[in-house]
Amino acid sequence: VGACSQAQRKTSCRSIFCCLLHWRRRRETCKFHGNRCVTSVSVALKDQRLRLLLTTYHQAFLSPGGGETELHQLAEYINDVGVRADLYGPNSRRLSAYDAVIHFSAHGGGEGLLQDIKAAGKPIVLIPNFNFFDQQHKANDVVQRHLDLADLVILRTNVEKDLCQKNFVIANDKIAVVPPGIAPGFGKPAEEGLFQSAYGLDRYILWVGQIAEHKRQLETIEALQGINIPLVFVGGYADKRYYDQCRAAAGDYVRFLPYMQPASEILRSAMQSCSVYLELGDDAPGFSSLEAALAGSPMVLNDHPWSREMFGSLQIYVEANNPTAIRAAVTTALDTRTRNQLTEEMRSRHLQPGPTRHLLELLKLKVGR
């Protein structure tokens, strides 16, 4: 190689170092000896990618639901597009190793963590996962503290942005709207008839999500009694007392199935094959409604501003506290059998990794990358 100092060789000829990052094979020319020192080496290039820490309030995973699933999926999507993301916990690194923090939820208990992150000088992106449509919410002070600590607030719809600015103190340039994303697996067709074969069904009405009082599954069960098409619930429950009430009110036509892995073939099959997809809670529908729209399912939804912005006028909307209207809407959807009205729009606007790339572009502006 020629005579050069140990320091020179360390930065040139022998630029091979141990690392857990991705390895790449390349030809490297010694900066001290030119072409006389060309060698083929495995070099672990210095990782210049963003590194993000994802956090939430500490009680979140005591009773995990859709929000916790979304947090896990967000970490996966971020890593898939080339940015390193870790969930906060025993296996995450020191805070100083991260360029920014994405905090999920404005639930009480997260403020102390965010205060420490802010004091360390790390940019905070907040995804509130808060029901801005509830004008009687008692946690407004807690939410305001989260908003104050954030450098960037990501909301899902323009109607949520308007409500946030109406009811809280926040600068317009601190808020951005990023459409909710659908797991890319939902874009794949499932084996035809898989769900029906597994559960002995033909036509059926589907509702995916946690059983909870504010979701109004009990009222739906009562409204659809005698409709003669099975009503299938997929998901766990938050309140066993309410779940037991639903089971007691359910006749033979109602099926309660356990939680299914997001984007799994059995869940995709359930959505792609159902006669009607139903979701009638007091709050905005969950991500499952977007997944059902991508699958082409006819849908009956609670008449909610979030739904109107997401789906326009192509779905059937109904007041969730009106049993007669619920039954009439479901009957209409069953008779119409119109499918695939929103499939292409959902694919282009909501299918991941598009929304995650949008989020990261906004975040990079905040951290100067």
Model segments located where?
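Conserved donor-binding/catalytic core segment of Leloir-type glycosyltransferases
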Residues: 1, 196-215, 221-232
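Conserved acidic donor-binding segment of nucleotide-sugar-dependent glycosyltransferases
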Residues: 6, 315-323, 331-337
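Nucleotide-activated donor-binding/catalytic signature segment of Leloir-type glycosyltransferases, i.e.
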Residues: 235, 243-262
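Acidic anion/phosphate-binding donor-loop and adjacent secondary structure
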Residues: 137, 165-166, 181-197, 203
